[in-house]
Regions:
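ABC-type nucleotide-binding domain
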Residues: 1-224
Length: 224
């Protein structure tokens, strides 16, 4: 069950089914059993188009397009292609505005060396462009699948600070292996082999002292 003003985190080991849940939510395919409720309504009662308008997802395997920065960002809502203020806002929230402002053509700069004057980006910079595309779209809920996997610690910290501002009046689903990033979620759902084995707040799951607490303590040891 999903309420559109919630901040939800999905956690679990690789292959546990976290991304599959997102694909079910977006109706890339329908469940063989059980139901998914969005605002107390079975998602199969929505048209695919109307359902997907509610979400702005970023998957781990996002694409790097050999387009301009403007085109890369506005792909999620091409009707707003000319809205420079909105593009710059999305770039700022993702942390991409700093390096884009240094390009000679700013947001009209082509990306990749396929173009004579194109700029080649690092993995972390491409990830910020993909995040900008997600944030550019007016939506009810963001879906972020490992959104900081290519970022350094400082950039990751700043990104999650920006998330807090973006989330104020919207919902979010976050998948992250770094459990320190999900502590503030309204609900943390622990997935194992395609099944929900625990759910609750960070405090509640730590007090259970089961799978989530074990994973969190293992990660925390690395920073002692």
């Amino acid at each position: 069950k999903l309420n559109c003003n919630q901040k939800i985190a999905l956690v679990g080991v690789n292959g546990s089914g976290k991304t599959s849940i997102i694909k079910l939510l977006l109706r890339f395919y329908d469940p063989n059993e059980g139901v998914i409720l969005v605002d107390n309504k079975d998602i199969r009662e929505y048209t695919v188009e109307s359902l997907r308008k509610c979400f702005s997802p970023m998957f781990q395997d996002y694409c790097n397009y050999a387009f301009t920065v403007r085109e890369n960002v506005s792909l999620s809502d091409y009707n707003e292609f000319e809205n420079e203020e909105k593009i710059k806002y999305a770039l700022d929230k993702s942390g991409a505005k700093g390096f884009v402002d240094n390009f000679p053509g700013k947001i009209n700069t082509y990306l990749t060396r396929q173009y004579e004057d194109g700029e080649e980006l690092s993995g972390g910079q491409w990830q910020k462009i993909a995040l900008s595309r997600t944030f550019f779209r007016d939506t009810v809920m963001y879906i972020l699948d490992e959104p900081s996997s290519a970022l350094d610690a400082e950039a990751e910290d700043e990104l999650f600070r920006q998330f807090e501002d973006l989330y104020k009046n919207k919902g979010a689903i976050l998948i992250s292996h770094r459990l320190s990033n999900v502590k503030s979620a309204d609900k943390i759902i622990v997935i194992d082999n395609g099944k929900v084995i625990e759910q609750g707040t960070h405090k509640e799951l730590m007090s259970l002292n089961k799978k989530y607490a074990h994973m969190y303590k293992l990660q925390a040891k690395k920073y002692e």
